[in-house]
Amino acid sequence: MIIMDYLKILEDLVKIRTDNRIGVKKAFKYLSNLFNNLGIKNTIIEGCFVAYKEKENFDLILNSHIDTVKIQSNFKKDDNNFYGTGVIDAKGNVVLMIHAFLNSNNSLLVISPDEETESNGIYNFCQYLRNKNKIQRGIKCIVGEPTDLNVCIGHKGRFEYIVESFGEARHASSQGLNPIEILSRVILDLKNLPLEKIKVDKIYSSSITPTIIKGGIQSNIIPDYAYVLFDVRSVEKDIIKKIDDFLSQKNYSKHIKSSLNPERHYANFYMLENKELINKLSKHFKISFFNATCEAYYFNKFLKADTIIYGVGKLELAHSKEEYLNLNDFDRGIKEVEKLAELMIE
């Protein structure tokens, strides 16, 4: 077993601000120096940091992401906890994956550069592996995210769904087609659209939530255009088609246009279907479902990899000023992730 000062590595990584591309490059340089000092090969492929012992021979991919959301709080620590943006989402879990990699023979470590934004890194990396025919049948993957040390066998899909509405600009005292009023009807109608639910350890539901709305240029002018962006989370397949079909039946349908925000890739709803693997893992770990979205979907879609999500930290603390990592949980995660990696490929 390789002995590492994981708390020092984690502190160093959290102190590198990675809510921007320059910071991500600095963090990857830090990781490269770390592995170079260990005599372990590493490189950058499609923007992802990759460490490997045998580049052509691996049956387990260990993944997490180095980027964070915009900084909510700076790093600090006490005897019990580390605090600050990134300690659980996901640099603490980067360190867990590093430990699993160092203590397994046939694994590949892949760290994403942009999971919180476009997901271009993993999207392109998975296609790179597929196109190079570098994937063995039956490959497995662990994605490091804050799951409170539960093994999550799936995650929600996420989409940015835009509805644009159109009318004619005119004086606010006149009557007629108002794009803002149209969008208010769209929002209320979608709130009443029946959505699916699933049960894993508890009930998880799809959701359609308006998060951005824009329109208008002056208080006394009815605008000719407005739009609303919905954050769509799914525990069902084809939810976008479901929304499209629903809106197409409304009497305002000829005055709206709907589409996905084209500026990013989207991870759809994912659920592990390997019942034998689930049963094996359930003997050692609590089985749950990741109530957000992550990049596990891409490993399954492009590489046909049986993928689970595992890591330290409570999901509800991520992206908040209250983000913290309990050090006892971190120690437990270090021990458990090594066992989890063994179970995935035995």
Swiss-Prot record:
User: Where along the chain is Zn(2+) 2 bound?
Assistant: D89, E116, H319
In alphabetical order, the GO MF annotations are: hydrolase activity; metal ion binding
Annotated residues for binding of Zn(2+) 1: H65, D89, E145
Cofactor(s) recorded for this entry are: Zn(2+); Co(2+)
> EC no.?
3.-.-.-
Keywords, alphabetical: Cobalt, Hydrolase, Metal-binding, Zinc
Enzyme group, top EC level?
hydrolase
Protein name (Swiss-Prot/TrEMBL): Uncharacterized metallohydrolase MJ1497
* Species of the source: Methanocaldococcus jannaschii (strain ATCC 43067 / DSM 2661 / JAL-1 / JCM 10045 / NBRC 100440)
